[in-house]
Structure formats: structure tokens, C-alpha cells
Design a protein with these regions (language model features):
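A composition/biophysics-driven feature that prefers long, compositionally simple stretches
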Residues: 1-255
């Protein structure tokens, strides 16, 4: 957290020693999470800021639920929350790019269900919830739904991507360089439309009026949430993909 005259880093006990060493002399204060004397970030902001001031954060890094809770608490002191900009962009010159590692298919022989079958299951769940479509932002849910795996996150076989599922169209938003010709052909045969990773917000902003959009508020970042037109109805709940992937089919059970 950076204010006009203070800066602080909040971290847990795994990094207390490392953070203390690396922050020494930097002017950045270490706040040790889970200790009784440590204020939360929200408490710090409420103490340091005044009515009429604003807090900026990158809406791609906060869930819709987290942003809503923070905005509500800040509003008690008439402090605004602005999630529209990444304030670090342009300052962090050597910032790593979004990973472009190639993805690979989780074959049906191991997953026990095709992509098309999984999309049908999700759409059935959406109908029962009274929703027309679903935003997928949790990487594990996307990997399960589209039978894909990757190496974007160390020790986790997930793929940096977004997805949108509806009866009419299922879209995987992913960097093109991650796709081989074989997996591109496979996904298209399964009824999946491929789109550039960065196009997700523009796509959501053009959803038809009166669409009923299912959103898992804890797993969808606030930038995606804010891109949904005001004419749409938000259906909140736990993602259908999260429920479905927890129910193991016979092939998956045999694989344990």
C-alpha cells in the first residue's frame, strides 16, 4: 500500500524474515499479518485517508466480492474506490509479460469426458440457476472445462486464460502463441471459439441486453464484473464448473 507519505507491505509468517531483510532502508514498513497489533489494509486506509480522497487498485487483481467489501467499508468515511487502472503500468519497466507457454490437451482417456460434454453439463446447470451464460476466471475451472493443462504457474498445471460459456457460444480467451495447430483444431471441433486473452472485457461489454450472467463473485475479478452492461442481470453463486469438477467420473476415479 502506497500513500502520499507512507508505504507498507503486508505479508504472512512465511516471509517475515525475508521481507524484513529486503525492506531494510527502503522506507517501506513491514506489516506482519495475523499478529494482534497489525492493522488490516482496510484499517490502515481508514486511519490514513480523509473524506473525499480515493483509493486506486488494479481491478484485475481483486475479486468482485473483495472490491465490493472494501468499497463499502471505505464509503463509511466517504472515501472512494477506483478499480479502473493499473497504476503500476508504465512504472514497472521490466515487468514480466503474461506467460506464453504452450498448452497441452488432457485426453478424454484420462479426463473421462469430452469438452463438449462438459459444456453441456455447465449449460444444464446454468438453466437450472436461471442464467444464460457464465464467466469463468478460475484457472482450475478453465483447465477442467476445456481439458487443457499448462505450465504457466509453477507446480500448478493451469493455463492463464479466461472463458465464457453459454448455450450459443463457448469462448476461450487465451494468447494465440500458447496454441498449437493440433489443439486449436481439437478445441474448434469441440465447439470452442478462440479469442485473444485481452479481448475478454470488450466481449463482455457487448453482451445482449437483459442477459442473465452467472458470476462467482469470489473468483471473478472486478474488472470483468464492471465490464458487464448495466442492462444485464447478475446471477451470483458458486461457479457450476466448480461443482461439476468435484464429482469424479469412473475414469477419474480409476486414475486415483
Amino acid at each position: 500500500v502506497v500513500t502520499a507519505d507512507k508505504a507498507g507491505l503486508w505479508t504472512d509468517s512465511r516471509y517475515f524474515l525475508q521481507a524484513a531483510s529486503q525492506l531494510e532502508g527502503s522506507g517501506i514498513e513491514l506489516y506482519k499479518l495475523a499478529l494482534p497489533e497489525t492493522p488490516s489494509i482496510t484499517e490502515f486506509l481508514l486511519h490514513e485517508l480523509h473524506a473525499g480522497q480515493a483509493v486506486g487498485l488494479d481491478g484485475q487483481t481483486y475479486s468482485a466480492a473483495e472490491a465490493s467489501a472494501l468499497a463499502n467499508k471505505l464509503s463509511r468515511k466517504e472515501i472512494k474506490l477506483d478499480t479502473s487502472a493499473d497504476l503500476i503500468e508504465g512504472i514497472w519497466k521490466d515487468r514480466p509479460a503474461v506467460p506464453g507457454n504452450p498448452i497441452f490437451e488432457m485426453p478424454e482417456a484420462l479426463s473421462g469426458a469430452s469438452v463438449h460434454e462438459k459444456l453441456d453439463l455447465i449449460n444444464n446447470q446454468l438453466r437450472s440457476e436461471g442464467a444464460d451464460c457464465l464467466i469463468l476466471a478460475a484457472l482450475d475451472e478453465i483447465a477442467w472445462t476445456f481439458n487443457i493443462r499448462g505450465t504457466d504457474v509453477t507446480y500448478n498445471p493451469v493455463v492463464v486464460s479466461y472463458a465464457f460459456v453459454s448455450e450459443d457460444e463457448s469462448v476461450l480467451f487465451i494468447k494465440p502463441e500458447k496454441l498449437t495447430a493440433e489443439i486449436t483444431e481439437h478445441l474448434k471441433k469441440e465447439g470452442v471459439t478462440l479469442a485473444e486473452y485481452s479481448m475478454i472485457q470488450r466481449y463482455l461489454s457487448r453482451l445482449p441486453e437483459n442477459s442473465r450472467v452467472f458470476v462467482d463473485m469470489n473468483k471473478t475479478n472486478v474488472s470483468l464484473y464492471d465490464a458487464i452492461p448495466g442492462s444485464c442481470t447478475i446471477v451470483e453463486g458458486i461457479s457450476p464448473a466448480n461443482h461439476l469438477k468435484s464429482i469424479k467420473n469412473e475414469t477419474e476415479i480409476k486414475g486415483f
